[in-house]
């Protein structure tokens, strides 16, 4: 039996492993298309600032083709380094595109103010055509409209510090778009705005350089549809992380934004580990979880073997990403979501509407948290040297805080409805005889003798109306502050007792009792 379990574990691990790369054949290359990437031909801030201005306007041009837009965005993303050309050549390894670097320098003869660097030949006309600037009269039209602040005509500056903060403001907006451009582009606007406000408050960006919605939508859509652009952005992030020593301020900002980008699309896998396994509740010992726990274990090993690109597998469209979806471990995922909802308020907005969601195991996770509140793990207690008295003290404190949190979350509990009872020294023969009541409404409820007898047990039929009114007043004083439902129940009980008294008197006198309508009595 032990060998069977060992073979099963090895089988599942082998099943989850991707095919290993072999040296028998060469790498498969696709049909490449050429991407033109513009880089500054000198170290002048004027050249970079003017190039940035022209590139930003090109992004918002609807006539720019997809490959050209990709090259423009790569140019903007690499402008913050000292040698953009060397950076691009070092990190680009894409089987779908071929990068062609073109240097630009200032020009007084071209309309756009830039030209392509060449040996003797004048390429001013080609530069104007590439940038889409045909004449000086279209300058205002081309330069305005892509910033929310309409008063800004252009973004050309001469100072290096001003250029860095301006470039950081534009780069921050592009990198923020990568976080949800693939996983949730339709609902990304709110989170993107929150992160923009964060960097504005930290003085990393300038709020006046916020791009308008049209410009941001164009960039987001291009990031979502172009895998080569995403490969470049991920490669740039990894290159920044690997670089030693102090990093430029823009590079540090990119690493900070990466905290929102990393593990995008892997929320189910990460949250299952966090709430399902790391909490170490005894429910993990269920037989139903044994197979899925082995699956999670093999996926964690696979995640480690993928290396530094593992957190970006969804952004990079790696085919192995499907193995990490919650459909591979539905019961454990449902249980983990129940645990997470009880432990963290932020989990309440998570979307659970999936076909493999199991409500039973979701409730299991919730109940596991509720019933384990205040309990101290014996393993952790022994590791941290916690005594039995200290563990008991912790349990008491946690129980009280949990009750306070539940009260604040659910609101005050409604008081129970209290009914009047007769004095205990009353004779037992004064109980009401069984009475049958039938509603005259079609399809109305029919109350049996036993039901009426149970609800009116202990009440006498000769209670005077004045005594009943006095009892009602006392009850109202004791129940002051309760909800209106309590008062309605008391009124209904009073009218039911009046009906009982009338029926009892009719039976005693031997007269035919008149027909009473329930609607009149209970109105």
From Swiss-Prot:
Pfam families associated with the record: Paramyxo_ncap (PF00973)
Biased composition (Polar residues): 501-511
Localization, UniProt: Virion; Host cytoplasm
Region (Ncore): 1-403
Record GO cellular component, one term: host cell cytoplasm
Chain spans, region Interaction with the phosphoprotein: 477-503
Main location: virion
Transmembrane segment boundaries: none
Residue span of region Homomultimerization: 1-36, 373-391
Region (Disordered): 423-442, 500-523
List of residues binding RNA: 180, 195, 202, 260, 351
Region (Ntail): 404-523
GO molecular function, a single term: RNA binding
Annotated stretches, region: RNA packaging and organization of the helical nucleocapsid: 1-375
Keywords of the record: Capsid protein, Helical capsid protein, Host cytoplasm, Ribonucleoprotein, RNA-binding, Viral nucleoprotein, Virion
Comment on protein domains: Ncore is globular and carries regions required for N self-assembly and RNA-binding. Ntail is an intrinsically disordered monomeric domain in the C-terminus.
Sequence similarity: Belongs to the paramyxoviruses nucleocapsid family.
Subunit: Homomultimer; forms the nucleocapsid. Binds to viral genomic RNA. N0 interacts (via Ncore) with the phosphoprotein (via N-terminus); this interaction allows P to chaperon N0 to avoid N polymerization before encapsidation. Interacts as N-RNA template with the phosphoprotein (via C-terminus); this interaction positions the polymerase on the template. Interacts with the phosphoprotein; this interaction leads to the formation of membraneless organelles that function as viral replication factories.
Purpose of the protein: Forms the helical nucleocapsid (NC) in a ratio of 1 N per 6 ribonucleotides, protecting the genome from nucleases. The nucleocapsid (NC) has a helical structure with either 12.35 or 11.64 N per turn, approximately 20 nm in diameter, with a hollow central cavity approximately 5 nm in diameter. The encapsidated genomic RNA serves as template for transcription and replication; encapsidation by N is coupled to RNA synthesis. Forms the encapsidation complex with the phosphoprotein protein P. Before encapsidation, the newly synthesized free N protein, so-called N0, is chaperoned by P.
Protein name as it appears in the record: Nucleoprotein
Organism, scientific name: Phocine distemper virus
Gene: N
């Amino acid at each position: 039996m032990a060998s069977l379990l060992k073979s099963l574990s090895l089988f599942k691990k082998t099943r989850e492993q991707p095919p290993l790369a072999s040296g028998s054949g060469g790498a498969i290359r696709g049909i490449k298309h050429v991407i033109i990437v513009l880089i500054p031909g000198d170290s002048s801030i004027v050249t970079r600032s003017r190039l940035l201005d022209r590139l930003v306007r090109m992004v918002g041009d609807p006539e720019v083709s997809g490959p050209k837009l990709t090259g423009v965005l790569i140019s903007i993303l690499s402008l913050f380094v000292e040698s953009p050309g060397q950076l691009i050549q070092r990190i680009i390894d894409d089987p779908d595109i071929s990068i062609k670097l073109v240097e630009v320098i200032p020009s007084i003869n071209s309309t756009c103010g830039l030209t392509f660097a060449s040996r003797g030949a004048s390429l001013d006309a080609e530069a104007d055509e590439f940038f889409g600037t045909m004449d000086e009269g279209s300058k205002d039209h081309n330069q305005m409209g892509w910033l929310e602040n309409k008063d800004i005509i252009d973004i050309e500056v001469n100072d290096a510090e001003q250029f860095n903060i301006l470039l950081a403001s534009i780069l921050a907006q592009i990198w923020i778009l990568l976080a949800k451009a693939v996983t949730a582009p339709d609902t990304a606007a709110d989170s993107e705005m929150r992160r923009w406000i964060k960097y504005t408050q930290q003085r990393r960006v300038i709020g006046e350089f916020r791009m308008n919605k049209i410009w941001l939508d164009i960039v987001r859509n291009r990031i979502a549809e172009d895998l080569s652009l995403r490969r470049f952005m991920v490669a740039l992030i990894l290159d920044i992380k690997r670089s030693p020593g102090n990093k430029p301020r823009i590079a540090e900002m990119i690493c900070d934004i990466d905290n929102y980008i990393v593990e995008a699309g892997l929320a189910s896998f990460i949250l299952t580990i966090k709430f399902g396994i790391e909490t170490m509740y005894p429910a993990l010992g269920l037989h139903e979880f044994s197979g899925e726990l082995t699956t999670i274990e093999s996926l964690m090993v696979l995640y480690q073997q993928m290396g530094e690109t593992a957190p970006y597998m969804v952004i990079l469209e790696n085919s192995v990403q499907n193995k990490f979806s919650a459909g591979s471990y539905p019961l454990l995922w449902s249980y983990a979501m129940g645990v997470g909802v009880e432990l963290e308020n932020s989990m309440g907005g998570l979307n659970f509407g999936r076909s493999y969601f199991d409500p039973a195991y979701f409730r299991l996770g919730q109940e596991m948290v509720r019933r384990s509140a205040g309990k101290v793990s014996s393993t952790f207690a022994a590791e941290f040297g916690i005594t039995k008295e200290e563990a008991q003290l912790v349990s008491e404190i946690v129980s009280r805080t949990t009750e306070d949190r539940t009260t604040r979350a659910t609101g005050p509990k409604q008081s129970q409805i209290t009914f009047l009872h007769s004095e205990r020294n009353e004779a037992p023969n004064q109980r009401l005889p069984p009475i049958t009541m039938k509603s005259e409404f079609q399809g109305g409820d029919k109350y049996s003798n036993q039901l009426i007898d149970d609800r009116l047990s202990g009440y006498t039929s000769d209670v005077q109306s004045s005594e009943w009114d006095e009892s009602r007043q006392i009850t109202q004083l004791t129940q002051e502050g309760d909800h209106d439902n309590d008062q309605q129940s008391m009124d209904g009980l009073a009218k039911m007792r009046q009906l009982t008294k009338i029926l009892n008197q009719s039976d005693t006198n031997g007269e035919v009792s008149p027909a009473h309508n329930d609607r009149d009595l209970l109105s």
